[in-house]
UniProtKB/Swiss-Prot annotation:
Function, as annotated: One of several proteins that assist in the late maturation steps of the functional core of the 30S ribosomal subunit. Associates with free 30S ribosomal subunits (but not with 30S subunits that are part of 70S ribosomes or polysomes). Required for efficient processing of 16S rRNA. May interact with the 5'-terminal helix region of 16S rRNA.
GO annotations of cellular component type: cytosol
Name of the featured protein: Ribosome-binding factor A
Biological process annotations from GO: maturation of SSU-rRNA; ribosome biogenesis
Cited NCBIfam families: PRK13817.1, rbfA
Organism: Coxiella burnetii (strain RSA 493 / Nine Mile phase I)
Cited HAMAP family: RbfA (MF_00003)
Family annotation (PANTHER family): RIBOSOME-BINDING FACTOR A, CHLOROPLASTIC-RELATED
PROSITE patterns noted in UniProt: RBFA
Disulfide bonding pattern of the chain: none
Superkingdom per UniProt: Bacteria
UniProt cross-references to InterPro entries, sorted A to Z: KH_dom-like_a/b, RbfA, RbfA_dom_sf, Ribosome-bd_factorA_CS
Recorded GO MF terms: ribosomal small subunit binding
Compartment(s) of residence: Cytoplasm
Length: 119
């Protein structure tokens, strides 16, 4: 990713996080966290990765984000000085959930080793 792509991705990440917190009134979107933004080389498309902060229905949140995409893009255009505001695509980030599962598996394996050694 070029420096320009990174700067634009960081700007979009920061602005979208702020807009979701202050401007969007959909309760399904109040408990999400934006984890990363990846932008195409031509700066016309951005993938916005998000995770859920609480146990929520991921499909419902995705539906709400898809519905709010046009509005968020409009707000982003007003909040930034970008010549072209990229098309937004929201993608559920499973990496945090995966890391948590791996951590639990490691803990179980360590506990099993401890119980095997003490026997």
């Amino acid at each position: 990713m070029s420096q320009r792509q990174q700067r634009v991705a960081d700007l979009i990440h920061q602005q979208l996080a702020e807009l979701l917190k202050k401007e969007v009134r959909d309760s399904r979107l109040s408990k999400i966290s934006l984890t990363a933004v990846s932008i195409s080389p031509d700066l016309k498309q951005a993938k916005v990765f998000y995770s859920l902060l609480e146990n929520q229905n991921e499909k419902e949140v995705q539906k709400a984000l898809n519905k709010a995409t046009g509005y968020l893009r409009h707000l982003l255009a007003q909040a930034t000085v970008l010549r072209y505001v990229p098309k937004l695509e929201f993608v559920y980030d499973e990496s945090i959930e995966r890391a948590h599962r791996i951590s639990l598996l490691i803990e179980r394996a360590l506990k099993k080793d401890d119980s095997d050694e003490s026997s």
